[in-house]
Amino acid sequence: MSNADKSKVVTTRWWWVRHAPVRSDGGNIYGQKDIECDTSDREVFDAVAKILPRTAVWYASNLMRTHQTAEAIWAAGFPKPASMAKEAAFAEQHLGRWQGMNRAAFLASRPVGSHWFADINEPAPDGESFMDLYTRVCRAIVRIDVAEAGKDVIAVGHGGTIKAAVGLALGGQPERGLAFDIDNCSVTRLDHFASADTSLWRLPMVNQQPWIADAKHAAMHQPAGPEVVPENKLA
């Protein structure tokens, strides 16, 4: 690829943050239930705030736990943005009548090696399949990627939502996204490279937990603001 061609590539960087832990679920599956999360661990949010880009645009699902998580990041010293768009397509999978069931007992009933609540094409009773979730998440990503082309996008979402985004970045293979752990408050970065005839993804980090690193390991807490300019390339 010539230098002229490289200059026409637009890079959009997605910074996915999973919401903080839910403590009030009673050990039950909550899916799309609008349930609050625990944002009391200041050390976690201090660390997350350090690696997110200051000039990003913000998105979150329509569920309160993603908004509480964003508020906790801002309270940790991250400059609060002028606005944060609410994107219902980034909500967790609707698990229908499985919501409210004991999580451990339900998962114990699934086949050994299962990465999710069910096969990707199996809908929950009166709910969604993972493929339903994947389809709506991908459509929203494509739409936002056009609207925010060339920017940093921070999206506060859910485990299933982020697994779907990883599946898209892995070449549109949702089942591969399910193989990844996405822990609470973890950061996953997916870079999209677009030109007139090319659309490619790169996965710089998945399930990064910056609070685990000791402060003396400066490389684990690299700044992500304007001073860091990611390479604008396709590979």
Predicted regions and their residues:
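Acidic, low-complexity terminal tails and accessory targeting/binding regions
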Residues: S2-R13, Q93-A105, V146, K151, ...
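Active-site-proximal alpha-helix that buttresses catalytic centers in soluble enzyme cores
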Residues: N3, K8-P79
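Phosphate-handling substructures
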Residues: Y30, I35-E36, A75-R139, P204-N207, ...
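Short glycine-rich phosphate-binding loop at a beta-alpha junction
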Residues: T55-N62, A85, D152-V156
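Active-site signature of alpha/beta-hydrolase-fold catalytic machinery across serine-
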Residues: A72, A164-L168
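His/acidic metal-ligating clusters that form di-metal
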Residues: D132, I154-G160
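GST superfamily/GST-like fold recognition
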Residues: G159-K163, S186
